Amino acid sequence: MNKGNLIENYAVALFNNAMVDNIQDKIFEEITSINRIITDNFDIREFLFSPIVNKNDKINAVNLLAKNIKISTIVQNFLLLLVKNSRTASLSNIVDAYNTLLYESKNIKIVQVISANKLQPKEQEWIKSLIEKELNQKTEILFDIDSTIIGGIVIKYDSMLQDYSIKGSLEKITKALKTVNVAA
């Protein structure tokens, strides 16, 4: 089984478990919070991701963490399953896949917008409204910054890429110039 399917399977299992009690949003908040704690804390991350650390010690750590931050039994059992199956290092990817499932269940499309500089709130709202009008669907926009695009924006969703950046335009011009046959 490839890693993408494995991650998706874990996310779907967690999502389906959450659907039983209609707590998909609550589970997302909890699993995102846990992921942030693990990601932000080097010692916890190394402890949980290390193949050298005994699984029983990891299980005890997850149980202690669950007790201290008061997470649901569903999330606690899910984390224990990841520990038992040596999949804790995949947690961030599982959270991303769960997020996608959550938005799909609400008929909301996740769209990534990349700009060279931080966009002002008015600009973000304007871009969001244009994208929602084009897609005829509600969206969750993830705004990212990549100074290498020089200017403009790049829009990504599903398998689509719309490049309105200066870098993209320059690359298209360069490619076009390379195809021109100039006789000497």
From Swiss-Prot:
Keywords: ATP synthesis, Cell inner membrane, Cell membrane, CF(1), Hydrogen ion transport, Ion transport, Membrane, Transport
Pfam families linked: OSCP (PF00213)
GO molecular function, one term: proton-transporting ATP synthase activity, rotational mechanism
Subcellular location: Cell inner membrane
Membrane association type: Peripheral membrane protein
InterPro entries: ATP_synth_OSCP/delta_N_sf, ATPase_OSCP/dsu
A GO cellular component annotation in the UniProt record: plasma membrane
General function of this protein: F(1)F(0) ATP synthase produces ATP from ADP in the presence of a proton or sodium gradient. F-type ATPases consist of two structural domains, F(1) containing the extramembraneous catalytic core and F(0) containing the membrane proton channel, linked together by a central stalk and a peripheral stalk. During catalysis, ATP synthesis in the catalytic domain of F(1) is coupled via a rotary mechanism of the central stalk subunits to proton translocation. This protein is part of the stalk that links CF(0) to CF(1). It either transmits conformational changes from CF(0) to CF(1) or is implicated in proton conduction.
Similarity remark: Belongs to the ATPase delta chain family.
NCBIfam families the record matches: ATP_synt_delta
Subunit structure: F-type ATPases have 2 components, F(1) - the catalytic core - and F(0) - the membrane proton channel. F(1) has five subunits: alpha(3), beta(3), gamma(1), delta(1), epsilon(1). F(0) has three main subunits: a(1), b(2) and c(10-14). The alpha and beta chains form an alternating ring which encloses part of the gamma chain. F(1) is attached to F(0) by a central stalk formed by the gamma and epsilon chains, while a peripheral stalk is formed by the delta and b chains.
Name under which the protein is recorded: ATP synthase subunit delta
The organism of origin for this protein: Rickettsia massiliae (strain Mtu5)
Organism phylogeny: Bacteria, Pseudomonadati, Pseudomonadota, Alphaproteobacteria, Rickettsiales
